[in-house]
Amino acid sequence: QKPDLVLDLGDRISDIDTQTDLRLEGEVADVFARLNAPVYHICGNHDRDHLTVAENEEILGVDLHNQVIDLGDWQLVLWRADAKIHRTAPDIGFDLPESDLLWLSHTLQHATKPTLIASHVPCSGHSQIGNYYFQRNESLSTYPQADRVREVLAQARVPLVCIAGHVHWNTVTTVDGTPHITQQSLTESFTTAGEPARAWGMLELGETVHWQVFGDDPFEARLTPSNQRWTAPLQPFLSKLAAE
């Protein structure tokens, strides 16, 4: 089955240093160039450790700013928010630029059709228990501003589905009526007994969204996104819990 498009969610390489990363990104770009389908790229943190967005753009030969793609009955929002992990104080970790958040807010407030939002970093806030990388590094599994991202998603009046990479496992988490998907990595091995997962996914968009992951860590889900949002959560039941 020929896809309508190929979506690269980022982390095309494991970063080493600038010169090595330039070479590795070029090798990956050559492989993508052979595909007989439109390819849309998002930068992950490993693509950004030693390289700029501009360098990634030059290697891939594409623009890597935020973008909306019309898919007919649906639209694809390529939310290419900054995915660089900062390693020096005071802002260690991810830091979501306000400009990226405002762009997403404006885009979703004006959305008129069901929307797939693709990013590198997930924003559902889902549990990282059991995750090899993030159980003990949960702050690096998402943006510190993830709660604001979810508030932005709640502004939309159309069905939404969010898909991300970064956390190296297959998950579905529904928050406020919006399904959040994370896709397993092609080369990850912590869920596959030390061998590469060889994972890749197929997403079919319609009234029901069908997601399949192939390879050695298979997964399948059928989702029915809604334009309705959930009732706001209750306040704490007990004053002691509120104080805590």
Model-derived features with residue positions:
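Histidine-centered catalytic micro-motifs
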Residues: I117-C123, C162-N170
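Short, flexible/disordered intra-domain loops and linkers
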Residues: D17-R23, A89-D91, Q128-L140
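Active-site glycine-centered loops adjacent to acidic/histidine catalytic or metal-binding residues
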Residues: G10-D11, G44-N45, H120, G165-H166
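Short acidic, glycine-rich surface-loop motifs adjacent to enzyme active sites
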Residues: I13, H106-Q128
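N-terminal active-site segment of His-dependent metallophosphoesterases
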Residues: Q1-D21
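A short C-terminal boundary segment appended to hydrolase-like catalytic domains
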Residues: G201, G206-E244
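Structural motif
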Residues: L5, W74-L76, P114-L116, V161
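Extended active-site neighborhood of metal-dependent phosphoesterases/phosphodiesterases
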Residues: Q19-H110, Q145-V158, T173-E188, T192-L205, ...
